[in-house]
Amino acid sequence: MEYEVTKDFDQITLKDDFMFFSVMSDKELCKELLERILDIKIKKLVYVAGQDTKKDSYDGKGVRLDIYTEDSENTVYNVEMQAGKSTNLPKRSRFYQSAIDLNQLHAGMDYDALKNTIVIFICTFDVFKKDFLKYTFKNICMEDKELVLNDATTKVFVNTTATLDDENLNPKLVSLIKYINSETITDEYTKKLDEAVRIKRRSADWRVKYMKYELNLLEREREGEKRLATLMDLLYKEHRFDDMGQVASDEEYRQKLYKEYNIQ
C-alpha cells in the first residue's frame, strides 16, 4: 500500500501532537510545562506515562496521544496538544476526567481515595473565542458563584493564539507559548525544549514510530469514511435527509446514529 505522511518528521514541532507526546515523556520537561501553565510549583513528579491510546478515545475509534502524570502531592495531570480544530473539547475533557476517576477508584473503595485531577488541553486555536491565554474551569453553584463544589477537578484550555502583550500575563507561560508557536527560544527552559525536539528529530527509532503513527491515523481515517458512507446510505434509504445534513457537521450526533444503526 502506498503511503505518504502528512508532514515530514524533520518538520514537526512541539505543536504537533506526536512531538509533544515524545518530548513531554521527559519528567523534568513535563514538570516545568505544568508549572508554567498552572502557575504553581510542583515538588516532584513521581510518575509520567505517555498514553498512545487507540481504543479509549472519545469516540472509541480515534487515537489519543496524551501525557498522564502524577505528583508527590496526590494530584493527577492529563495534558494533550490539540493542533486541529475540534468542537468536542469540552465534552472530551469530561470523558478524560471520567476515565481518570474510573482508573483510580476500584470496587469498594471510598470516594475520598480520588485524587485531585487537572485535565489540560494546549490548543493552537481559541476554543471559546475570548482571546484569553488560559481558560480554567471548576464546578461552581449557579445560584451562588462564590460557592465552589470542591470535587477536586479542574479543566484548563490553553490558547496559543491569544494576544501576548498583556503585562499581567505570566511571562514564563508567554515564553512557552512563543516557543510552541514559532520555536522562539527566550529562556533556559525553551532552550531545553528545543534541544529535546532536535534530539527526537535525529532519532531513527522515533522516526519509525512517527511513520507507524501516521499510518495508523490514515487507516483509521479510511475506516471512518467507510462508516460514514454506510450511515449515509442507510439514512438515504429511510429518507432521513435532515439527519444526513446534521451528521456531516455534528460528530456527537454522528456517533449517536452509529450506535442506533450498530455501525462498528
Predicted feature residues:
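Short, charged alpha-helical interaction segments and adjacent helix-coil junctions
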Residues: M1-D10, L14, F18, Y77-Q82, ...
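Accessory alpha/beta interaction modules
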Residues: M1-T154, L164-D166, E251-Y253, Y258, ...
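Extended serine/threonine-enriched, polar tracts that run as long, contiguous segments within proteins
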Residues: N159-A162, N168
